[in-house]
Amino acid sequence: MIKLRVMTLNLGGGVKNYSGSSEDLAGKTEAINRLIAQVHPDLLAVQEIAQHIDADGNLDSMVDLIRLAAHFDHAFYGETLSMKRHMQVKKDLMINGLFNDWWDWSKGNALFSRIPFSRLGDESKEGVPRNIPIFQPLVYEGTRDTDPRNVILSRLKVAPFPYLLNLHLTTLTGERGKGAWADSIEQAKLTRTQQMERIIGLLETHVLMKELPIIMLGDFNANP
């Protein structure tokens, strides 16, 4: 049986990856890479990871920075929120980006591995993870309540060929802290339950009913 060291890490806001001075950004990146190096995981699931196009038209991506620094052989980025698709509401971020010479900012989840990914339906062949929506609001309003949510679904190309999940479930305004609202707490629990039910439905026929192994990582925004 293969032994794996797994790690999950929320970077605390894709926006923050590209705000502040260049010295601040370098310090954040160094701290993240140092933490990952200390753990040295075989599998790493990251939430709220960001990338953008710089002034010269080059892709500036935390996914690439982590992959290269930690020497991961395989990486996949799944976008959940983007400047071009959603920022017509949160236009302060768009304007800040335009006049600081970066564009096409997006954030999402990422999966890193030292083992190849396989196809979901054929573990003998290498494949590409899938980025699957589990919550898509009719209108994005620039708030966490309407943040789109996706799950990355993949599989490892090594016995026993476990399926991999990287998810980031919803958290609602008003559900935390001393001033938390009871209605918000209950609505948040219901929303996360619905998202988990969608994931279970996604896996039920081809994974769960066959009792195949699953490794589920992510930020569940919930108490154990």
Language-model regions: role of each:
Residues 9, 46-47, 167, 217-219:
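Active-site flanking residues adjacent to catalytic metal/cofactor-binding acidic residues
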Residues 65, 172-224:
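Metal-dependent phosphoesterases centered on the DNase I-like endonuclease/exonuclease/phosphatase
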Residues 38-39, 158-159, 206-212:
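Glycine-rich phosphate-binding loop signature in dinucleotide/nucleotide-binding domains
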